[in-house]
Design a protein with these regions (language model features):
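Hydrophobic faces of well-ordered beta-strands that scaffold small-molecule active sites
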Residues: 17-23, 40-50, 65-69, 132-138, ...
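C-terminal extensions of enzymes
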Residues: 325-397
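N- or domain-start disorder-to-order transition segments that initiate the globular core
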Residues: 1-48
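Catalytic alpha/beta core domains of metabolic enzymes, predominantly
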Residues: 186-333
């Protein structure tokens, strides 16, 4: 009998917690084959991965309960099968020789989202719209345009009822979340890094729900999650530089605790706010730290037991399954950050501000260095897709 995987052990601590696939479902089969080929015990790995997701499973038996994507992950789906997508794009060009690269980009982006959502639509239907959501992101280049993000969200959601719209944590993004919620469109607040953004999202969703209910909008297929990009807060911002400026030496464990402290606080805020009927979603996790020679995954261990969503990219899953397969979990999410560690972290302005509910105004969200870096990364991926399509167009000129 094959032993429970590390992911099954995590979910056993809190059965309401959800595991999502952080990539396009279109790349899952190729990734699965690579993982099995790399495994010391291919049979055990096959069983493990087929428990995560397999078309042959009854939908309710798959451990993966949803999907998150972004432009970079959508681009990866094209790179995973470039010959096919080149041909598909060429057919689009032939069908409409007047379409430019941006128009074909958007059509291609929607098609990859539609197919990915289709892989989880059976679960969405079997669970009566509780699980099986597919997060498709509005164009990150429009992150300061509430009108455009709202229109794109409505268009993307129209492709499949289980498509949830990822909207970034900018002031304009929260306005778009309010508008989409008022229409009954499910949302995922992405590029969220600090507690002020969590508060802003809860407020936007609560306002949108009030409007939706007043207008009699059908909310049976609606849902909200708030994504905290955990390690991006610790590694892309000013945590280490500001610590050095005031003479603090931060260990790898300290950095992980900083990220975990934010997630724990966000989970508590949701528990205390019944007007927000959504969940936190934990992303950007790391296999870390190593303590006394033992490899930990504190992003999972210290949050285990919380009723949240964990979204798991292929690279993290590979590290987890090969480096920490014997990890055990106990219910730790409500346990406080060690007081000496929290006191140390609160001396760092970057952390102290991120930890406070009023640390940032909505207009200041876009100034956060980790948000800026992440938004540029996602925007660059969108531009790369446009450039790929422009190359195909040049073949027809």
């Amino acid at each position: 009998m094959v032993r429970p995987s590390v992911l099954e052990k995590l979910q056993a601590v809190q059965p309401l917690a959800e595991l999502w696939w952080d990539s396009s479902p279109l790349v899952y089969d190729a990734w699965r084959r690579r993982m099995i080929a790399k495994a010391d015990d291919p049979r055990e790995m096959t069983v493990c991965l087929d428990r995560l997701f397999c078309d042959a499973n009854p939908p309710e038996q798959n451990l993966f309960r949803g999907v998150t994507t972004n432009p970079r992950l959508t681009l990866n789906a094209i790179k995973d099968n470039p010959a096919y997508w080149s041909g598909w794009i060429d057919d689009v060009i032939r069908a409409d020789r007047r379409a430019d690269a941006e128009a074909i980009f958007w059509k291609t982006y929607k098609e990859i989202a539609r197919r990915g959502a289709g892989a989880f639509l059976p679960q969405f239907e079997a669970s009566r719209r509780k699980y099986g959501f597919f997060s498709a992101q509005a164009d990150p280049r429009a992150r300061h345009d509430a009108d455009r993000m709202t229109a794109q969200g409505i268009e993307l959601h129209g492709l499949s009822p289980n498509i949830m719209i990822k909207i970034p944590g900018t002031a304009e993004g929260y306005e778009a979340i309010r508008r989409l919620t008022a229409r009954g469109v499910p949302t995922n607040n992405t590029v969220s890094l600090v507690i002020s953004q969590v508060v802003a999202c809860m407020e936007a969703v609560s306002l949108g729900l009030r409007e939706a209910r007043a207008a009699g909008v059908d909310l049976s297929g609606w849902r909200s999650v708030i994504t905290v990009m955990s390690s991006r807060f610790g590694t892309l911002g000013a945590l280490q530089p500001e610590a050095e400026e005031i003479g603090l030496d931060l260990s790898e464990s300290d950095v992980r605790w900083a990220e975990i402290a934010l997630m724990k606080r966000a989970c508590r805020l949701i528990e205390e706010n019944p007007a927000y009927p959504g969940k936190m979603l934990l992303s950007s996790m790391r296999v870390s730290p190593v303590v006394d020679g033992y490899t930990h995954v504190w992003h999972l261990e210290k949050i285990a037991g919380a009723d949240i969503v964990y979204t798991l990219p292929p690279s993290f899953l590979e590290s987890l399954l090969f480096q920490a397969p014997d990890l055990e979990f106990t219910n730790q999410w409500a346990e406080p950050v060690p007081p000496p560690v929290l006191e140390k972290l609160l001396r760092i302005p970057y952390f102290e501000r991120g930890y406070r509910e009023d640390g940032y105004s909505s207009g200041e969200f876009t100034s956060h260095p980790a948000l800026q870096t992440t938004a540029k990364e996602f925007s660059l991926a969108a531009r790369h897709m446009v450039e790929f399509i422009a190359e195909r167009l040049r073949l027809f000129s």
